[in-house]
């Protein structure tokens, strides 16, 4: 059966349930027994059924709508990325539907499917990590997808990023030149593709190439309190220089160091890798790997407009320039 021809009736017949039951399953209604829900979902996947949220008569027409998936609407990193996306969307007369997957009880693939059900013309996915659920959901659709500020492990989806290995290596060289030899890489999630495939290998290579000892990677540092509570452990281990991937955590780390009498940058240096506005308003101001967040979003949206118009991409994986902004949290020798 051609997947374009599959209807809710076909799913109901195959699953031996009513069309109303299929509708309840599709819409996430909990008033369906697990056994029945599982059977309906199996048929939906097998038949590649994609329910329409608009009239069937509009099925072949464009909605001029783009779906934007973000993990956290309050995170400045994603807010600045979104600004670039929105400006280009307005320029090309696209509307944006934003879906957040933060603190969702439903699975991420259900959030993605909810967007696809609205017949968006394309999707931009922003997250620190492309989950297996998201990747599988994107593979099941013909809707164009672009990743902004993240990558897939096998580079199967178009993306816009910076050269994370090069950026982190330059930052580590700055710390080493300042005399800091016990270094830390502090990340939110080791399994995030950017960390696992780029940042962590760059850190490990730098430590090995320079024969440094006592260096360490710290995981699961995601908010202010995580950063604040981490510093005593760093101090105990003699860590005197750190790259941290989340700005809000870097502020916690900075304040904790200062509260415990450490001199920044003389005793302890910090470089943050996100470079949102937070990094510039704290004192001492934080040295940052400045990512062009607005441009990352704008370029991702421009790529998506091409894909939605069946145009080819000259480069599926665009690397934008970064800048190491030296401020008061490093000696900058």
From Swiss-Prot:
Recorded coiled-coil stretches: none
Lineage top rank: taxon: Bacteria
DNA-binding region: 8-27
Keyword terms: DNA-binding, Transcription, Transcription regulation
InterPro entries, A to Z: HTH_LacI, LacI/GalR-like_sensor, Lambda_DNA-bd_dom_sf, Peripla_BP_I
Keyword DNA-binding included in the entry's annotation: yes
UniProt GO MF annotations: DNA-binding transcription factor activity; transcription cis-regulatory region binding
Residue ranges of every copy of the HTH lacI-type domain listed in the record: 6-60
Function: Transcriptional regulator of the pepQ gene for prolidase.
Name under which the protein is recorded: HTH-type transcriptional regulator pepR1
Source species: Lactobacillus delbrueckii subsp. lactis
Gene assigned in the entry: pepR1
